[in-house]
Amino acid sequence: PAGLADDLAAAFTEKTGVEVEQFQGTTGEILARLEAEQANPVADVVILASWSDGLGMKADGQLESHTPANADKVNEGWIDDDNMLFGSSASAVGVIYNTTVIPELSADWSELADAQYKDMIAIPDPEKSGACKDFLAGMVTGMDNGEAIMQSWADNGLTVPGANKAALEAVTTGEKGILIAGVDYNAYSSMAKGEPLNIYYPASGTVVNPRPAMILKTAPNMDNAKAFVDFL
């Protein structure tokens, strides 16, 4: 989230005197920029909303190994075995719905394929939303009949309006009634502004996405990059 990123950068600068230049965007936008800058690397540290995309960067040999300070205090499973991905924060995805269109909703994931929700459901684009990509991966690997459930959504008129914000906007305006794999902080931010939204987490469970912070092997400022990850 932009506010969290800005606060972290400001706090790091206050502590170390090192200025932080940021590029903020969707997971897809960040990965595209890194690819465009391969011949002339600019970034030192990358934080994504998708652990799976971080693993992809690791597999491609893009990441530097580092054992950060306070690594023993990080949640179990939030650092990979090679000390290349560090969970810096997390988001939980749930079901966001428009309370004007649907006053109350508590349907489980599979029940969102019911006829009463025909053509009312949307989901973020997983090519642009790292949180959604990890949610779908969790559905496939961690839930019984996950693939069948996703197919049932498609059969029930599921649409893909765009990245997280575009998908949420479709529900906020009432164009759609329900957003599957909605990011929690986006929902709470909109609700605080008075938008007719609510969010819940289905009874069968959901996916919590650690956001990996990673040091690039090509980091022009390697010492500062390691210091920033230590700070996180």
Please give the residue ranges for each predicted region.
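Bilobed periplasmic-binding protein/Venus flytrap-like ligand-binding cleft at the lobe interface
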Residues: 108-116, 211-232
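The catalytic Nudix box helix
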Residues: 5-18
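Short, catalytically relevant binding-site loops at active-site mouths
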Residues: 167, 184-188, 204-207
